[in-house]
Curated annotation (Swiss-Prot):
This is B1 bradykinin receptor. GO terms for biological process: cell migration; inflammatory response; negative regulation of blood pressure; negative regulation of cell growth; positive regulation of leukocyte migration; positive regulation of release of sequestered calcium ion into cytosol; response to lipopolysaccharide; response to mechanical stimulus. Induction: By lipopolysaccharide (LPS) in heart, liver and lung five hours after treatment. The gene is Bdkrb1. The keyword tRNA-binding does not apply. Disulfide bonds join C117-C196. Glycans are attached at N13, N21, N192.
């Protein structure tokens, strides 16, 4: 059981190649047994709340009763376009979680066939990128609203938001193409399982995957999120100094706290995943060969995957609330 750590049978995004000699470290079997018993229940819980939250967000934005709720404005605003796309992305994302939970609970013996192996893994991978890129787009939109409020309105920006969302979905699909093409179910005789794994045809693919996942999927988006939110905080701080007599302090403090919550949520949910994904790259290129670190990387990836998936539950709550608060704050500056 523990030797599947060497296989790195992550269901969503990791590349795996079964080594000829399968070994395990002392104490690893117990750790994997505990993970396979406990983790599926947590994943199903995340799936339930993720489905509920994102369906509620989409129903508010898109269903006909929204017209009764907000009669004066039937078209989606810029923020709502991004939030609706984020909810749709997270909804598709969490639909793949039951397959992942079953895979882990079944001790990584994939029971759904090769087609679902490729489709589920590819869809999860695509929406990993789509969700992160949309978070960047939301941060950029709020940056423009609060730092340059007088130039941030109009139909032209609405069309730009729609085009931006379309490009983000296309980019997510393109970045997940290797997963769609190279995922398959392979028999692992040593473990007596048929595993859904990603086998790269050449060692160079490991470096490509690291750049794609860690750089394009985390470091660059993180830099953009930090840049936009730093300037938002600086703008709010300046507005607070200029408008003390208008009782703007509490609202500014609430907005600043929300911004810090957004950034902290992104880091807490995604940083562990990308840290262990980078360790996995070092294992694949044989920079790390110690048994302990290999086992730690494999177990860490499974747990970090879970924290990344939790983000799909937090997004509806955080970003919809953030959208309403930011809209109120921007209208107050005009």
């Amino acid at each position: 059981m523990a030797s599947q750590a060497s296989l790195k049978l992550q269901p969503s995004n990791q590349s795996q190649q079964a080594p000829p000699n399968i070994t395990s470290c002392e104490g690893a079997p117990e750790a994997w047994d505990l993970l396979c018993r406990v983790l599926p229940g947590f994943v199903i819980t995340v799936c339930f709340f993720g489905l509920l939250g994102n369906l509620l967000v989409l129903s508010f934005f898109l269903l006909p009763w929204r017209r009764w709720w907000q009669q004066r404005r039937q078209r989606l605003t810029i923020a709502e376009i991004y939030l609706a796309n984020l909810a749709a992305s997270d909804l598709v994302f969490v639909l793949g979680l039951p397959f992942w939970a079953e895979n882990v609970g079944n001790r990584f013996n994939w029971p759904f066939g090769s087609d679902l192996c490729r489709v589920v893994s590819g869809v999860i991978k695509a929406n990993l990128f789509i969700s992160i890129f949309l978070v960047v787009a939301i941060s950029q939109d709020r940056y423009r609203l609060l730092v340059y409020p007088m130039t941030s309105w109009g139909n032209r920006r609405r069309r730009q938001a729609q085009v931006t969302c379309l490009l983000i979905w296309v980019a997510g699909g393109l970045l997940s193409t290797p997963t769609f093409l190279l995922r398959s179910v392979k028999v692992v005789p040593d473990l007596n399982i048929s595993a859904c794994i990603l086998l790269f045809p050449h060692e160079a693919w490991h470096f490509v995957r690291m750049v794609e996942l860690n750089v394009l999927g985390f470091l660059l988006p993180l830099a953009a999120i930090l840049y936009f939110n730093f300037h938002i905080l600086a703008s709010l701080r300046g507005q607070k100094e200029a408008s003390r007599t208008r009782c703007g302090g509490p609202k500014d403090s609430k907005t600043m706290g929300l911004i810090l919550t957004l950034v902290a949520s992104f880091l807490v949910c995604w940083a562990p995943y990308h840290f262990f994904a980078f360790l996995d790259f070092l294992v694949q290129v044989r920079v790390i060969q110690d048994c302990f670190w290999k086992e730690l990387t494999d177990l860490g990836l499974q747990l970090a995957n879970f924290f990344a998936f939790v983000n799909s539950c937090l997004n509806p709550l955080i970003y919809v609330f953030a959208g309403r608060l930011f809209k109120t704050r921007v209208l107050g500056t005009l």
